[in-house]
Design a protein with these regions (language model features):
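Gly-rich Lys/Arg/Thr-decorated short loops/hinges at beta-loop-alpha junctions or inter-strand turns
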Residues: 86-95, 120-122
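Acidic/polar active-site rim loop that often engages polyanionic ligands
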Residues: 58-61
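Short, compositionally biased "basic patch" segments
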Residues: 69-90, 104-105
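Structured, non-catalytic alpha/beta "coupling" segments that mediate domain-domain communication
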Residues: 64-65
Length: 231
């Protein structure tokens, strides 16, 4: 009722409302603002791991990334265009988007770390999420562990992989954080040092997120911001 009520209020105010996709919940958290400044068009994009909710914002730990990066802005524009067209098959240069490219993108990044480990190169995977239940990604993480990849995970809720099993998950370390605020951010990092690739996302590695929702994982390429997230 609340959603319908506010949608009607916004439409009455002249806003165009996009109602999303049939059978898929839009769970991504993204906002893009375009403005004309001194004769040029500037675009600002905000991508977060948490909801636009003033109550949970006081209780949850999340990340909010605000950028004028044009490639991110182009992907944001493409995302909203596809949302308006109810098109799930969009092409993105930076984003990994569920239900089409998020799971496969994460699995490809895991495969790259497996290849490094097999070539006796440093290989590491860091994941922080609320819950971990996607069977295909679980199997891939177990494969990474067996290959010698160091896997470190911070998981707040459901976790369907057992760390420390001999010859299976020896290289997986899992922790939970209990503090004043609820840990809600999702972070996925692959590699070490300067070669590390890092994404923030609205999605947990759960089948409902990777296959049944519209989600975004956005790369963080600024060195200072990456370092701050990894602290």
């Amino acid at each position: 009722k609340n959603n319908i009520h506010y949608a009607e209020l916004l439409e009455e105010a002249g806003c165009q409302i996009l109602y999303g996709f049939v059978d898929y919940k839009v769970h991504s958290k993204i906002c893009t603002v375009t403005k004309k400044h001194k004769g040029t068009i500037k675009q600002y994009t905000q991508i977060g791991t948490g909801n636009y909710n003033e109550k949970t914002a006081r209780l949850y730990v999340d990340y909010c990334y605000l950028t004028s990066n044009q490639e991110i802005g182009d992907d944001a524009t493409e995302f909203f265009k596809n949302l308006a067209l109810a098109n799930l098959q969009g092409h993105y240069n930076k984003f990994l988007v569920a239900p089409t490219s998020l799971r496969s993108g994460i699995m490809n990044l895991i495969d790259k770390e497996i290849a490094k480990a097999k070539n006796n190169q440093p290989a590491e995977i860091l994941m922080k999420m609320n819950s971990f239940t996607d069977r295909r990604i679980i199997d891939k993480i177990a494969k990474a562990s067996k290959a010698g990849v160091t896997v470190k995970m911070i998981i707040r809720g459901i976790c369907c992989i057992i760390p420390g099993l001999k010859d299976k998950t020896d290289n997986i370390e899992i922790h939970g954080i209990v503090g004043r605020y609820l840990e809600h951010s999702r972070v996925y990092a692959f590699g070490v040092d300067e070669d590390r690739v890092l994404y923030i996302s609205s999605a947990d590695m759960m089948t409902r997120n990777t296959a049944k929702r519209v989600e975004i994982a956005c790369p963080i390429e600024d060195k200072a911001i990456k370092a701050r997230i990894l602290e």
